[in-house]
Design a protein with these regions (language model features):
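Conserved hydrophobic positions within beta-strands
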Residues: 9-11, 64, 72
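Beta-solenoid/beta-rich acyl/carboxylate-transfer cores
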Residues: 45, 63, 69-71
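Generic structural signal for buried aliphatic residues
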Residues: 46, 52-53, 73
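Short, Lys/Arg- and Gly-enriched loop/turn segments at beta-strand edges
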Residues: 56-65, 82-85, 107
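Acidic, low-complexity mobile loops and tails
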Residues: 1-48, 88-120
Length: 120
């Protein structure tokens, strides 16, 4: 299992051929306490830059975008009914989507730094 980070505030956890995307500590800090969440993309094929989720937090209203292409295999629909799950530090609770068919080189371009400063 490997975890990498995207500059827009997402983490990506790779476990075999499954890639779990969730809200990182940076994303939580940027948005503040999440009060509303809209999962824009819940099925099908995801392209890099597609909006996957819109959130309203104490500090900002933000759209989060996909860091790479992939096939959605699961969406955490619980975060729409309980958006405070995104405030959790637990990756079992704060995940957004799970993908397959991700190119390894796209994943490897993400940062190893928890608080990346710029997009690679």
């Amino acid at each position: 299992m490997t975890i990498k980070y995207h500059v827009n505030g997402l983490y990506v956890k790779k476990d075999g051929d499954l890639y779990q995307i969730g809200l990182s500590g940076k994303g939580q800090d940027d948005v503040g306490d999440v009060m509303f969440c809209d999962l824009v993309k819940q099925e099908g094929y995801l392209s890099k830059g597609d909006t996957i989720m819109g959130v309203e937090g104490a500090k900002a209203v933000t759209d989060f975008t996909a860091p790479f292409d992939g096939q959605i295999v699961a969406a955490n629909q619980a975060i729409e009914d309980q958006p405070d799950l995104l405030n959790s530090s637990s990756q079992e609770e704060n995940w957004i989507l799970k993908l397959q068919e991700v190119k390894e080189e796209d994943f490897n371009r993400l940062s190893d730094q928890v608080w990346p400063e710029e997009d690679d």
